Swiss-Prot record:
Domain of life: Bacteria
Pfam families associated with the record: Ribosomal_L21p (PF00829)
Keyword set includes Glycoprotein: no
Keywords: Ribonucleoprotein, Ribosomal protein, RNA-binding, rRNA-binding
Any single Gene Ontology cellular-component annotation: ribosome
Subunit (UniProt): Part of the 50S ribosomal subunit. Contacts protein L20.
One Gene Ontology biological process: translation
Lineage: Bacteria, Pseudomonadati, Acidobacteriota, Terriglobia, Terriglobales
Family: Belongs to the bacterial ribosomal protein bL21 family.
Magnesium found in the keyword field: no
Protein name: Large ribosomal subunit protein bL21
Function, in words: This protein binds to 23S rRNA in the presence of protein L20.
């Protein structure tokens, strides 16, 4: 049983109990995040969901920064070199529950 959600401009396939790193997201006071943009849902029958019919609840486990990515610009014969680094911020979450049409699917 899984769902496909969209957050941070990316799509993720999630199931109850999954741990994943997403783009930095704001959580509630109690550390919960609710994803209401569910694109697809697979249960016993597997189906595409109507907008607003399903939601995914997750809890925040931590925040951090990803590995450094180096960007190197170089122009030959001109002695031009520029090195720049980038570390993307992320939020680590654990999927607690998938709710659709009054039914709730939780992690075992």
């Amino acid at each position: 049983m899984y769902a496909v959600i969209r957050t941070g401009g990316k799509q993720y396939r999630v199931a109850p109990g999954d741990v994943l790193k997403i783009e930095t997201a704001a959580a509630n006071q109690d550390g919960q995040i609710e994803f209401s943009e569910v694109l697809a849902f697979s249960g016993e029958t597997g189906s595409v969901v109507k907008p607003g019919a399903a939601k995914v609840l997750a809890s925040v486990e931590g925040e951090g920064r990803g590995d450094k990515i180096l960007v190197f610009h170089y122009k030959r014969k001109k002695q031009y070199k520029k090195l720049q680094g980038h570390r993307q911020n992320f939020t680590q979450i654990r999927i607690q529950e998938i709710q659709i049409d009054g039914n709730s699917y939780r992690a075992q």
